[in-house]
Amino acid sequence: MYIGEKIKPQKGKILNNLKKLKPSFSTYVIVLDFREKQIEIYHNIIFINICKTQKSNRFIIIGIAANKQEAFRLVRDIVQDIYKVGVGLDFSRLSGLEVK
């Protein structure tokens, strides 16, 4: 999982809140969307609302960030790591927090 520098001290609390679908106001999540087959960035409140209304296992959280700028940096890091390893966008090789 990719964790932004500004959010590292609160990592445990934020991940627990996400598992419980409980919002944190200044957090962005980076997710794999299996239906759309792409990486997406959501403010966590919007993401939680999507999870509650759709009730599907279409997302895996692969990163959390303190703000949108940090989320963009993490996505850049993810893409660079994917191409270093040479897996393309093979979602099965990325791990994260499954949202149910």
What is the predicted function of each stretch?
Residues 56-61, 66-81:
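A short, charged, amphipathic alpha-helix used as a generic interaction element across diverse proteins
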Residues 19-26, 99:
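A broad, low-specificity signal for short, low-complexity segments enriched in glycine/proline
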Residues 23-59:
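Short aromatic-glycine-(Arg/Gly/Cys) micro-motifs in beta-strand/loop hairpins
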Residues 20, 31-35, 73-80, 92-93:
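A general structural signal for short secondary-structure boundary/capping elements
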Residues 1-19:
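Negatively charged, low-complexity tracts enriched in Asp/Glu with abundant Ser/Thr
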Residues 83-100:
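Charge-dense polyanion-binding interfaces
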Residues 17, 41-47, 78-81:
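Short, solvent-exposed coil/turn linker segments
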